[in-house]
Amino acid sequence: EGGSTAGLSATPPASLPGSLTNVKALQKSPGPQRERKSSSSSEDRNRMKTLGRRDSSDDWEIPDGQITVGQRIGSGSFGTVYKGKWHGDVAVKMLNVTAPTPQQLQAFKNEVGVLRKTRHVNILLFMGYSTKPQLAIVTQWCEGSSLYHHLHIIETKFEMIKLIDIARQTAQGMDYLHAKSIIHRDLKSNNIFLHEDLTVKIGDFGLATVKSRWSGSHQFEQLSGSILWMAPEVIRMQDKNPYSFQSDVYAFGIVLYELMTGQLPYSNINNRDQIIFMVGRGYLSPDLSKVRSNCPKAMKRLMAECLKKKRDERPLFPQILASIELLARSLPKIHRSASEPSLNRAGFQTEDFSLYACASPKTPIQA
């Protein structure tokens, strides 16, 4: 968490300083352990007697007053993110819901019931939630900059091998979320963080609508997220709920575009409403001719598949992950052959991507 989602802006704050040193301790705290009802410790039994009969998701509620809210990091259509303190550094997302109805509160707790079970190396750790003074989700604080910041602000020179690994880790995290029936709804480079420049951490999935568990409130069924990553059907908003696994796949396709071009799509259009109109009606697609010549052909094909205008024509993440893993396994062989003599080197440059660096002038779009 931490990339700015202000309105529909594509511009995030610069970086996310912080600490993850307390995460392990927090995982051992009484809150998460409460999920294991079979604990035999007398301390846990006494706590159960004190707390009485409770719903399992309630065990993750952080009482009012325990979280110290600090610096504002960014805001978006769903809420505002702050750096906070709760047994260490945490990210606190305050939701844009005032005086929630009982139905909204129950829907929120239903979602928490799924989020509390998410544990994956490529997603930010969910640590708890609060309902007072307002609904908030608390996650691990990620030390590292967003992918957006790396690509479009400081123009980090990533080798192609690293870019493909970022894509692989992102697909791996999304495949896990979808296996849990969690739709991200706002996947973008602002919400993908590189912890210590090595490990991908997907953030801001805490407001994903969980299939079959959302209880009918349309509080969040408004145009949300940044438009550059929105699938055409999401922009059109013709369906009751246009978000789907495939709309996440489209957003991932835009992330691939960022990785393989070093640019944002539609860089020649500065009018937000024009982008919404043209993408929503199928008149505008990312210009794949801007993909670098040394981008693997298989990656370019995958990108085009993810960016299909018709939702049902896009692949799902199990297939996407398998494709990227297959490509990644071919990297050592290609890397070796690139350094060996060959009588047939003509034309090889299009696939020789071991020394690719993502560094070109870019002008981030205010979309």
Swiss-Prot record:
<dbReference type="Pfam" id="PF07714">
    <property type="entry name" value="PK_Tyr_Ser-Thr"/>
</dbReference>
<dbReference type="InterPro" id="IPR000719">
    <property type="entry name" value="Prot_kinase_dom"/>
</dbReference>
<keyword id="KW-0808">Transferase</keyword>
<dbReference type="GO" id="GO:0005524">
    <property type="term" value="F:ATP binding"/>
</dbReference>
<dbReference type="GO" id="GO:0106310">
    <property type="term" value="F:protein serine kinase activity"/>
</dbReference>
<dbReference type="GO" id="GO:0004674">
    <property type="term" value="F:protein serine/threonine kinase activity"/>
</dbReference>
<comment type="similarity">
    <text>Belongs to the protein kinase superfamily. TKL Ser/Thr protein kinase family. RAF subfamily.</text>
</comment>
<dbReference type="InterPro" id="IPR011009">
    <property type="entry name" value="Kinase-like_dom_sf"/>
</dbReference>
<dbReference type="InterPro" id="IPR051681">
    <property type="entry name" value="Ser/Thr_Kinases-Pseudokinases"/>
</dbReference>
<dbReference type="GO" id="GO:0005886">
    <property type="term" value="C:plasma membrane"/>
</dbReference>
<feature type="domain" description="Protein kinase">
    <location>
        <begin position="67"/>
        <end position="327"/>
    </location>
</feature>
<feature type="active site" description="Proton acceptor">
    <location>
        <position position="186"/>
    </location>
</feature>
<feature type="binding site">
    <location>
        <position position="93"/>
    </location>
    <ligand>
        <name>ATP</name>
    </ligand>
</feature>
<keyword id="KW-0553">Oncogene</keyword>
<feature type="binding site">
    <location>
        <begin position="73"/>
        <end position="81"/>
    </location>
    <ligand>
        <name>ATP</name>
    </ligand>
</feature>
<dbReference type="InterPro" id="IPR017441">
    <property type="entry name" value="Protein_kinase_ATP_BS"/>
</dbReference>
<protein>
    <recommendedName>
        <fullName>Serine/threonine-protein kinase-transforming protein Rmil</fullName>
        <ecNumber>2.7.11.1</ecNumber>
    </recommendedName>
</protein>
<keyword id="KW-0547">Nucleotide-binding</keyword>
<dbReference type="InterPro" id="IPR001245">
    <property type="entry name" value="Ser-Thr/Tyr_kinase_cat_dom"/>
</dbReference>
<keyword id="KW-0723">Serine/threonine-protein kinase</keyword>
<keyword id="KW-0418">Kinase</keyword>
<feature type="compositionally biased region" description="Basic and acidic residues">
    <location>
        <begin position="33"/>
        <end position="57"/>
    </location>
</feature>
<dbReference type="InterPro" id="IPR008271">
    <property type="entry name" value="Ser/Thr_kinase_AS"/>
</dbReference>
<keyword id="KW-0067">ATP-binding</keyword>
<feature type="region of interest" description="Disordered">
    <location>
        <begin position="1"/>
        <end position="64"/>
    </location>
</feature>
